[in-house]
Design a protein with these regions (language model features):
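Alpha-helical segment of the N-proximal tetratricopeptide repeat
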Residues: 30-60, 77, 198-220, 224, ...
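TPR/TPR-like (Sel1-like) alpha-helical repeat modules
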Residues: 110, 123-128, 142, 146-149, ...
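Helix-start (N-cap) detector for alpha-helical repeat units in TPR-like alpha-solenoids
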Residues: 31-32, 65-66, 99-100, 133-134, ...
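Structural marker of alpha-solenoid helical repeat scaffolds
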Residues: 60, 94, 128-132, 167, ...
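Canonical tetratricopeptide repeat
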Residues: 70, 104, 139, 143, ...
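Terminal, low-structured helical/coil segments at or just beyond the last alpha-helical repeat
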Residues: 170-208, 213, 344-384
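Structural signature of tandem alpha-helical TPR/SEL1-like repeats
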Residues: 43-53, 77-90, 112-124, 151-159, ...
């Protein structure tokens, strides 16, 4: 499984090896070149041997960043994650320009139960631009998505997987991870119960078909999912997301069925509320959102506040809207949607200076495209 092993081909993706400067035609240079060549040759098949050779080369030139990064890759292959992280960190301290090095460090940290730091380093690598091979990028993005799913950040997990839709991916791990997103199931992919795995697999297959622009196949797969597993948690929610673009009333019915079957399914409550806002029934939305607020994870309370603010705006309750949207802004200050609606609330209340300030903040954050700015529910078209 990705994240537990590091394919040999990926070493070539880690960096573009640039030999350090050493005086030409010296014993040290000749010895260094010999050690680095032998280490490179051993890297895929004999990582233990490669590590020792790289260490000898680094004794000659300790500031050789690429050597530290290759040691980190070899240690990762051997599942010596703490040592791998240390070696990668040394290499990146010397040469922080290697995007794939940051991504690999994130993969290594993810095996040390340091999810926050792992995600930070993976994102840094992504922002710099992962390059070299689709399989490497897939491994990185799938692992990041799995970490996010465990904390119920299904929106960000989907954002990690979305770029992979343009590649000819046939890896089952991609579909499994997509299945957990579609079902809004916050579990470790390795801990899926045997009886649940078929549900996750089929949900992932359907969601992946939809994401890769195969709507007919997705429709058939979602119908199969619903027919086979009508009482499994998340199934009606997943089908409701699929229906949003074509039949919003049917989607609403699916979300309501999900809540009936699974009263703790807060994503369905948020979906119901967002549809109710669109349908012009903010009072009903407020009721749904207060119910969701009681059970949603802490990192999703901001979304409850945001939609409560939107509902209050529609109900011409500017004071209530401002209170809710200010609460959302405190939790996610870099979210452009929050600043957009807060500007509207201030404008409705006649607070022009505050409205102008929030509009400017919205424009700034929108340009930066904060990853929290497009929740999964919104990305499926529930609210704009």
């Amino acid at each position: 499984m990705w994240g537990r092993s590091f394919p040999g081909w990926a070493f070539a993706l880690l960096i573009v090896c640039v030999p350090p400067y050493l005086p030409a035609q010296t014993p040290s240079r000749e010895q260094f070149d010999d050690l680095s060549r032998r280490a490179q040759a051993a890297l895929d098949s004999h990582p233990d041997e490669a590590i020792q050779l790289y260490k000898q080369a680094l004794a000659i030139r300790p500031d050789w960043a690429e050597g530290w990064l290759y040691i980190g890759g070899a240690l990762y292959q051997l599942r010596r994650y703490a040592e791998a992280t240390d070696a990668l960190r040394k290499g990146l301290d010397l040469a922080p320009i290697f995007a794939n090095g940051w991504a690999l460090q994130g993969l290594s940290e993810s095996q040390l139960d340091d999810a926050d730091q792992a995600l930070a380093d993976i994102r840094k690598g992504e922002q710099m631009g992962l390059n070299g091979n689709v399989q490497f990028e897939t491994a990185v993005r799938v692992r990041a998505a799995q970490l996010l799913i465990r904390s119920s950040a299904f929106d960000e997990a989907l954002a990690q997987l979305q770029p992979l839709t343009g590649y000819p991916n046939e890896a089952p791990t991609v579909e499994e991870t997509m299945g957990l997103c579609a079902l809004a199931s916050a579990v470790d992919i390795a801990a899926i119960p045997p009886g649940r795995r078929a549900v996750v697999d089929l949900a992932g297959k359907a969601a992946w078909s939809f994401a890769t622009q195969h709507p007919d196949a997705a429709a058939a797969e979602y119908r199969e999912l619903l027919a086979k597993y009508p009482n499994e948690p998340g199934v009606h929610y997943a089908y409701g997301l699929f229906l949003l673009e074509t039949d919003i009333k049917a989607a609403l019915a699916e979300f309501r069925t999900e809540v009936q079957n699974n009263p703790q399914h807060w994503p369905s409550m948020l979906a119901i509320a967002s549809i109710q806002i669109r349908q012009g029934t903010p009072e009903k939305a407020i009721e749904s959102l207060h119910a969701a607020m009681k059970i949603a994870p802490t990192n999703y309370r901001w979304l409850c506040h945001l939609d409560l603010g939107r509902a209050d705006l529609d109900a011409n309750n500017s004071a209530g809207a401002i209170a809710e949207l200010e609460a959302a802004a405190r939790q996610v200050p870099a979210n452009p949607s929050v600043h957009f609606f807060l500007a509207e609330a201030y404008r409705q209340a006649g607070r022009k200076a505050d409205a102008d300030r929030e509009k400017a903040e919205f424009e700034k954050e929108k340009a930066q495209q904060d990853p929290l700015g497009v929740p999964a529910l919104h990305s499926f078209g529930i609210s704009k």
